[in-house]
Each structure stands twice: as structure tokens, then as C-alpha cells.
Amino acid sequence: GAFNDTTWRNMSTSSVWAQFYEGSNVFTIFEPNDSNCTSNSSTNLYNIPGLDHMCLYDSSSIRDYARLAYGTTYDKRGPLLRNNLVMFYNTTLDNGVEAYSELSYYKSDSSKQLYGGAPLGMGTSAKNGGNTQPILVPSTNYWLNQLQRPNGDLFVDKEGDELWFRRFRFSTPRSWDSTRETWRVVQGFRGEWNSWDWDSGIVVSRATSEMDNHGRQSMTLLNAALADSTPNAYNPFCAGVGCNEEAFTVSIFRNNTTELFSADLKMSNDSVFSMPAGDVGMLVGAEVRKETMDDARDPRINGTIVYSTPPQAANQSTFPYISDIVNSSPSPNTYGERVVTSLFSELQIPLATNLDSQLAVRAENSDDYGSNVVGKFALGWEPTSWGKLRASTSTSFRAPNLITVNEGLVVRNNSQEDALLTAALGEEYPSGYSIQRVAQGNDDLEAEEATNSSVGFVLTPGDNLIVTVDKWEIATENTIGLFGERNHILLDTLIRSRGGVNECVGNPNVIRGDFIEDNDPESDTYNANWNPNLCKAGNVVRVNDTYLNLDNRTLKGTDYAIEYSVDTDAGSFSAKFMRVQFDEFLQEASGPMAELVAASGAGGPLEGLI
């Protein structure tokens, strides 16, 4: 039938029924009643005396029962408790000035249980310890030395004295507890001075988030438990029973704090001066704002406790490219702050009896990303009592957030297709695997800038009916983002394709391992048919990516709205229909991105790879 495949299975091949590499051979743990386990005369079969719930067999097959069903221990939604407190106090002082105060507090407590963690990069890349978090079962492991054939021959004598994990997941479920608190204090004053209304106030806010993660595994402690030569050693062949995971199971934390201080003064006058069509209104103001953020990570994540891959591993790595926690990428502590000062003004100018205009300007200076000046001009013409035409043009900016400016080296794992392997070995080659992306903040970032324009009309054919249509366009420059792992790998493939067999460097932001020959036609990583026009290269170890100001972007659209309201003896009722239509989305390719687009065309070196 239509659903008779694995598409809807939503299960993981990484489970407690582990797989291991011994050289190029794959050994898998099976249930005792599996056909592989009942082959008592087979030289490919191994058991551990006293463990009757498993066997180890020389096979890469993954049975249905060996796939993890996430829902076994996973909470779709854990308990959540929220508390809010908001208090207001307004009063008028003896001098006529109004004072207003606000105090608010928010707290939430939540928790959730997940499933066991799996090391990063499990799969074919784990051969010889080439994955992100390679795990070695060393020759000293007690349980490895207990594996034996039905005739008593030991695994370490007949196969090898060490194994690499290929697919695996710990049996201890992960979980987390989270507490978040936010408080805010506002104190303001408003009054009149001559013909001006004024309003001034301060805002102080602080938010904290404390999260504890449980059921996590330390790579350092795990290696020590695997190296143990006593029955207290971690048993990698346990299939979820009597594994001895307690010795390396730990809890870790992440604590975040953000703070905001803001003070401002605004003054407005409905009639600064008069024109033939009416009075001109004006608003002026100033603001100073300080923002801080502090992201504190656990010592096993931030590099205080440093983990390095085993010396036998093909992937030789350490912090900041890997952390000491299974299934977690490294993240440094991050701190950032900025002080922003702003001046702004606005004019409401009547140009004719039925023609109004608005003019606004805002200048802002930040001590990290620089200065910006933006403005707005708008017109509203009402030729009849039931119709109005309106148009506006403005400039705006979006500041880079504190993380994109201040973040240190942050490594994340994502599954990506390696275009070079596809180009060199064909579309049938399994070119998708886990790749590290190394991102970093950039203190040279500029704010995104945009030009916004719109034109439309408002119709009020009756007292209770309003119809609006607006055509708009947003053109953005210096969009902030990452070039992306896939684009970096495509650029690497393009450079190598253009350079031929002598181009062995490619994109310097793509770090590749050594090429490992596999001449076994039965192997899923067979590569003896490598394209002779390309320099041989190994899998991508990591891709270096930095936040940048990227390409220009244009977005066009049309907004429609119809609103009808009616008053009755039973109350007031209203209905509103809104539609947002995107007419065009255009992102201009520039620099390396333009090269990729050009190379992906018919006959180009990247044809069929994008």
C-alpha cells in the first residue's frame, strides 16, 4: 500500500542494539532468538557467558526490533507551571505632574523526559573512529574479553582486540528541568510645560533561565569505564540490561541572564506653528538604552573540562571542536553588552484641507555596530468622505543581536550531502553524513538596512464597513546570516572541479580528512572508481562559517482587509477578513553565491548538484 515503507516509521537505527566496526567488518547485537544467534556452528557468532539476552554476529543488518521507538520514554509535553504578578500605581503629585509605576514578575517551572543519547556522527563515518565523537572499545575492556564463539574461541583472538561504535544509543533516558524568571520595573512621569506635553521614564528589566540536563554521558568518564578490566567496566554489549552506565552518567547546566536599562524623554506639541491648512504637530525625544547578555555553559561543554578523541581515531579532535558530553556540541561562555543612544523627531504637517503628511527621522548610535539614521515620509489624501489614498516611503534598520556579534566559536553537527563525493563517485554513492559547522560571531557586522514603500486606499462606503488595499515593497541590504555548510561544500566542489586533479585544497573553509581507500566492491564506502579528473579527498570534518552581511533582498506584496461592525441591543459585533499576498521574493546572488548559481546551469560543473 501507499504507507508500506519506512517513511512513516519515525524510528532510529541508533539503539541499545549496538553495531561496531572491526576494521571494515560490522558486528551487530541481536536478540537470542534471532536466526543469527541460533547458528551455533557459525564462526561469525559470539556470546558472553551469563548474558542470555543477546548475541554478537558479523552482520550489518538492522532488525525492526532493534530500531528505537522514541515514544518509549519520551514525554510529548512535560509539566509546566507559570506564575505572573503585575502591579500598577498611578498618582498625581502636588505640582500637577502625574507619576506612574509598574512592577511585574514572571516565573515558570517545567521539566521533560527524553530518550537516551547517541554519540554524534554515528554511521559509516564511524569506521576507524572517523566520526565526530568516536568511541573505542579498547583491548582492556572486561566484556570485550568475555566474547567467545560456541567452541570457546575468544573474539580478541579471532577478530581483533578493539572495536569502534558504529550505531548505538545509551539506555539511560535524558531529561531536563527548567526555571525561568523575569522581573521589570517601570517608573515614569508625565506633565505639561508651556504648550508641550512631556513624558519621561526609566525601565529596568532582568530575565534569568536555569536549565539542568540529566542522564547525560561524559566522554572522559566513558573512556575510563570502557578501559576497566574488571566486571565493573561499562558493558557495550549489554543491549540495555546491566550496562553499568552510572559511572559516566552526569548532569550538566546552562544558565542565561539578560538585562535591560532604558531611560527616555519625549515631548510633543499639537501646534508648534500654523499653516494655511492647519496646525503643525511635532514630537521630539531622546533615549539611552543598555543591554547585556550572559550565557554560562557547563564546564564539560565550555572547554573547562577538555576531551580529546582517542589517539587511534581517524578523527583527531579536541575542544573547541568537540565537547566532553555525548550528543552535545561544544559551546563557549558568551557575554555581550551594548549602549545605544537615540534622537528622534516627528512632524504632522497639513498640506491642504484634505491632504496630510508625516515626516519622521531617527538617529541611533551603538557602541558596537555603529550609527544609523532612518526616516519616513507619508501622505494621506481624502478626496471624498468615503475614500482615502495613502502612500509612504521609509528607511529602517535591524541591528545585529548580541549573539551574532559576541558569540565565540560554536560547533554544531548537521547531516549534509557532500557534493564532492557525488561528483567523484556518482549519485548512487551514500554522500550524506554528519558534518560539523563551526560558526563564530563577528564584531564587524553592520546593521541590516531596508527601504520600505507602500501605496493604497481606504474605503468607508458605510458607517460600519471599512475596505483597505495596500501595495508594498521592502528592499533590504546587508542581510545578516551564514553562508551555510552546503554552500561552502558546493564552493569547495566547484574550486576542485575547475582545478582538476592538481587542485587538492579547494575551499579553505571546508576542512577534509585524509582519503581512505576502500577497494571492496561489497562495501557501502567503495571508492576505487573515484573520478580521475578530481583530486582525491576524504570526508568533510568541519566547515568554518562566520556571520556576515550577505546579499540584497527584495520582497513585494499586497495586503487586503475588510472589516464590518454592527451595534445591537445584545452588544457590538465585528468581523474582519485579512489577506497578505506575496507577489515577489528576489534575493540577489553576489560574490561566491553568484558563482554557485552560474555553475549550476546546464553544462556547468555543479549541474545536478544543487
Regions found by a protein language model. Give the residues of each.
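Surface-exposed, low-complexity loop segments enriched in small/polar and acidic residues
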Residues: V26-L80, V86-F88, G96-V340, D368, ...
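Conserved C-terminal beta-signal and adjacent last beta-strands/turns
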Residues: S178, T558-E584, P605-I610
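Solvent-exposed loop/turn segments connecting transmembrane beta-strands
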Residues: E337, E364-V373, T451, I562
